[in-house]
């Protein structure tokens, strides 16, 4: 690999916003927020909406996402279209 052209690849803690589950992995993402991991070290914290802990494919359970508000907002903005 050429030096100086690749982003920094470092340990990062990802947190599932809906379950609170945290994962320590490596990524090029950075964040101003930090978290202290089980090993006592401080790592950047990235909060994500969906992980394998909350996605219906991996959990096998249906989870209601907050799409009702988005649909209503879309209908208010563009109106409800009637089919012929």
From Swiss-Prot:
Entry-linked SUPFAM superfamilies: L28p-like
Pfam families: Ribosomal_L31 (PF01197)
Origin: domain of life: Bacteria
PROSITE patterns: RIBOSOMAL_L31
Entries under InterPro entries matching the protein: Ribosomal_bL28/bL31-like_sf (IPR034704), Ribosomal_bL31 (IPR002150), Ribosomal_bL31_B (IPR027493), Ribosomal_bL31_sf (IPR042105)
Record-annotated disulphide pairs: none
Keyword set, alphabetical order: Ribonucleoprotein, Ribosomal protein
GO cellular component: ribonucleoprotein complex; ribosome
Single GO term (MF): structural constituent of ribosome
Family the UniProt entry places it in: Belongs to the bacterial ribosomal protein bL31 family. Type B subfamily.
Subunit: Part of the 50S ribosomal subunit.
UniProt name for this protein: Large ribosomal subunit protein bL31B
Organism name: Rhodococcus opacus (strain B4)
